[in-house]
Amino acid sequence: MRTNYCGQLNSAHVGQKVTLCGWVNRRRDLGGLIFIDMRDREGIVQVFFDPEQKEAFSQASELRNEFCIQVTGTVRARPDSQVNKNMATGEIELAAESLSIFNRSEALPLDSNQTNTEERRLTYRYLDLRRPEMSQRLKTRAKITSFVRRFMDGEGFLDVETPMLTKATPEGARDYLVPSRVHKGKFYALPQSPQLFKQLLMMSGFDRYYQIVKCFRDEDLRADRQPEFTQIDVETSFMTAEQVREVMERMIHALWLDILNVDLGAFPVMTFAEAMRRYGSDKPDLRNPMELIDIADLVKNVEFSVFAQAANDEKCRVIALRVPGGASLTRKNIDEYTQFVSIYGAKGLAWMKVNEKAKGIEGVQSPIAKFLTNDVVNSILAATNATDGDLIFFGAGRQGTMSDAMGALRLKVGRDLELTDLNAWKPLWVIDFPMFEEDEDTGSLSAMHHPFTSPKDLTPAELTAHPVGAVANAYDMVINGYEVGGGSVRIHRNEMQQAVFSILGITPDEQREKFGFLLDALKFGTPPHAGLAFGLDRLVMLLTGTDNIRDVIAFPKTTAAACLMTNAPSFANEDALKELAIQVTEKEVSTDNE
């Protein structure tokens, strides 16, 4: 039906007869001629209809925006005065000789001349995807997946599919359950990841596996989360954590070169403890130059009890955050930041403006200065490398709360004051995560990554004796404050796997019920293995410069896990439920999926 794409025509096609298919992007009548901008997935080209081509000209008079058409004509060079350097096809135009209207269009419910609400865009997603910026994002996504497949194939990895209907296993989030018609009362679970299957593939001898795969998690959504998402899933046998990281770093490095022509350089490696200490986050955004400084040793004996109490409690932190040029902040600004950190559990935010550092306590402005000595103030100024015109924020309290609150404040202030270099790329590896997280209230332990992660350099007995403080052989790749991938060395011995399950409070009977197949497989010569998974959607989001993951998925869900276009989820009919032996005891009253 066509010989070329609109956006791929150029001066090399001058004199050629071509046939194009696409949509009317815009129509205008000028000096007895009809001009249209014709659009397809590759771009836009100008088409003009001359009255001498009577039939085509007559049909062209009926054209309106978004009519779907076919045009045949001859490519010709535009006069120099009419060259449009803002268009990829701006040096040429198509002289139309025939026109077919495939389909007419009603007035669009989306207005291309103004910003449409996301709700409206998602309701008419098929129209939203016609927009060049949306089309370009999906094309980039396709380019990324093709690149990943070529890279992984070249490294000797095998693309192996794993099941979509599987067994519910505890992996952190809630499962999406699928009822079985044949086995009434039983349910499949949609996989949160192919984790156990890819480990079983290692046990089967497929020592290099990858898959670009859909995963499902029934969890609260954020701007960078979806209930169904895509992973680049990787697993290897007989490779160390360092070797896995080396291969994956090469892939991401090559991907950025291919898509953006950006050299990411070597990725620095930072421990979890260092990341939390310096940045208050296990996914630090290194584009922001500010760091958290622990000053507990400097304020243990001050009269300000908020500082002194926290400084003398090993479970607490006293943190200083120097803001370059921050002395210009108003009291209203500071109050707003104080309110901001309260979201993360902080009970307050102290501050100090540095007017003349050389004068010590006399050269600073702070509501807490009266509780501090000149020596303490000088020590704080030295520890934070403060200079005249800076402001120092302080937080004191429990370690977790302070890391979260001051880490979030660091990010917000960095953006607000334009201290963060938004044009830079700052990747790194974060390693040596805690094996377990301890609930501050109950003291119970949960796996920080998942229960199949191997500890570093511990026997099952040593891990059981001292689980708190154990370090996992785990690693995350972080780019510009986003965790784009995470992985670990896996447990490959039965005794260690049972020990981890027991520490997590999973009884032997529950272990057999939920993970019997895995425990059995670990008895038969399981090789050492390690892996990693990248969030494809998040990678595409970064590479296309958007901050909303819904912009890089063709048909995404809302933050309420609903599809506004199809009105999913929807009620099932009674016959279908009866066949599945399911009785609905409570229904959602509202059908509003917003």
From Swiss-Prot:
Q: What is catalyzed by this enzyme?
A: tRNA(Asp) + L-aspartate + ATP = L-aspartyl-tRNA(Asp) + AMP + diphosphate
> Pfam families from the entry?
GAD, tRNA-synt_2, tRNA_anti-codon
Chief location: cytoplasm
Q: What class of enzyme is it?
A: ligase
Where found in the cell?
A: Cytoplasm
Which Gene Ontology molecular-function terms are recorded? aspartate-tRNA ligase activity; ATP binding; nucleic acid binding
Q: What GO biological process terms does the UniProt entry carry, in alphabetical order?
A: aspartyl-tRNA aminoacylation
Task: Report the EC number(s), separated by commas if there are several.
Answer: 6.1.1.12
Q: Which GO terms describe its cellular component?
A: cytoplasm
Q: Where does L-aspartate bind?
A: E171, R217, H449, R490
Q: Region Aspartate: what ranges?
A: 195-198
Q: What does this protein do?
A: Catalyzes the attachment of L-aspartate to tRNA(Asp) in a two-step reaction: L-aspartate is first activated by ATP to form Asp-AMP and then transferred to the acceptor end of tRNA(Asp).
Oligomer status and interactors: Homodimer.
Q: HAMAP family under this entry?
A: Asp_tRNA_synth_type1
State the name under which the record lists this protein. Aspartate--tRNA ligase
What organism is the protein native to? Proteus mirabilis (strain HI4320)
Tell me the organism's taxonomic lineage: Bacteria, Pseudomonadati, Pseudomonadota, Gammaproteobacteria, Enterobacterales
